Amino acid sequence: MVSVSKLINNGLLLTSQSVFQDVATPQQASVQQYNILNFLGGSAPYIQRNGYGISTDIPAGCEIAQIQLYSRHGERYPSKSNGKSLEAIYAKFKNYNGTFKGDLSFLNDYTYFVKDQSNYAKETSPKNSEGTYAGTTNALRHGAAFRAKYGSLYKENSTLPIFTSNSNRVHETSKYFARGFLGDDYEEGKTVKFNIISEDADVGANSLTPRSACSKNKESSSSTAKKYNTTYLNAIAERLVKPNPGLNLTTSDVNNLFSWCAYEINVRGSSPFCDLFTNEEFIKNSYGNDLSKYYSNGAGNNYTRIIGSVILNSSLELLKDTENSNQVWLSFAHDTDLEIFHSALGLLEPAEDLPTSYIPFPNPYVHSSIVPQGARIYTEKLQCGNDAYVRYIINDAVVPIPKCATGPGFSCKLDDFENFVKERIGDVDFIKQCGVNSTYPSELTFYWDYKNVTYNAPLEL
């Protein structure tokens, strides 16, 4: 099996220290390719995107004129449904009559990483977790770094508007981000106003999670991802059970052990379950997850571009709005919502649908690099002389707009970006194509009416 090596920077690598043997210093080794966080499907801690070497600094000769953030919540515990599956497996381990041998020998003195069931679906914090990847702490750091870079846009003694879905963990992330951004000036209702937007279908298009209102998307399902060969799971089950006769471990259980590895890292900083699999098995499982997400939340689903048009159109309108006194737009939602937005935007869209009969190398759609825990999309509006430009930073890496990257810092002129958006979603009618109830709001307005309308949906898990 792969021994997950820990480096000084707490990187978790699917390789041994031999990767350094033929180079003079560790700095010469390309170890990022082995980082286990690449292979855990976005369930594990945040990981920066592998970019193109383009500096994320504001380009010389330009000023930042507006910044938009669309962020996923931070690292969390497994959901209640995930937790139920993991507990069922743990019950099998606890009820096993015998001493565990082989790769599972650690189970002889192992304790389940979720000590309190009320933590399911919650964001990890220093209070409820033991590791270094607390979601609240990472959100705090993110907010502070964001202020350091874009603080010139923030008007002192003003009220910072923040837009968050009414998921408890999403709201929690937004709060800690705001604390990091505002520091000692943080005061709810005075220096920051949280606009809590319902995730329910009845808010229609006036939502950070418009997928809820798209009834036709709920009717749509793709069986494409199910064609992927998962016989490797049988081999894992056989390998683990062989020295432990009588243990009933199904392929579904094995698949869930990959998630166990990821979520335990969120809570404890590491997991012995990560050592159960080979390098190839991590890659195979990761691609299976990429397929599932691509054909449900990505461009493989014909409705995602339609749903994503709601946020993308609003983003474009904000970029064009020069009269608004606020130029710092902070929005928080879920991985599904960010992935759907990406489907509309198209920067990370593969040239062809993902194949199910083989793993393409390089893989053009790695879910963990698109929406890891704490994922973030920055939309920068740059003012360079008399011209305005748009640039995207996705998970801390500049991702140029296809065929529109000749501006400073590989940005795209705002007028050209508007044409790009029209080409992507100009033919979309969210209300009609999604079958949205005619009594629901037909457009997103909260970015413009939040000062006069109260958005305070009750928090839910």
Swiss-Prot record:
Cysteine disulfide partners in this protein: 62-384, 261-274, 404-412
Top EC class of this enzyme: hydrolase
Glycosylated residues in this chain: 97, 157, 229, 248, 302, 313, 437, 452
GO molecular-function term, one example from the UniProt record: acid phosphatase activity
Membrane listed as a keyword: no
GO cellular component, one term: fungal-type cell wall
Keywords: Disulfide bond, Glycoprotein, Hydrolase, Secreted, Virulence
Binding site for 1D-myo-inositol hexakisphosphate: 72-73, 76, 79, 169, 293, 334-335
Deletion phenotype: Leads to decreased phytase activity, reduced ability to form hyphae, attenuated in vitro adhesion, and reduced ability to penetrate human epithelium.
Documented EC number(s): 3.1.3.-, 3.1.3.8
Cited Pfam families: His_Phos_2
Subunit structure, as described in the record: Monomer.
Protein name as catalogued: Phytase PHO112
Originating species: Candida albicans (strain SC5314 / ATCC MYA-2876)
Gene name tied to this protein: PHO112
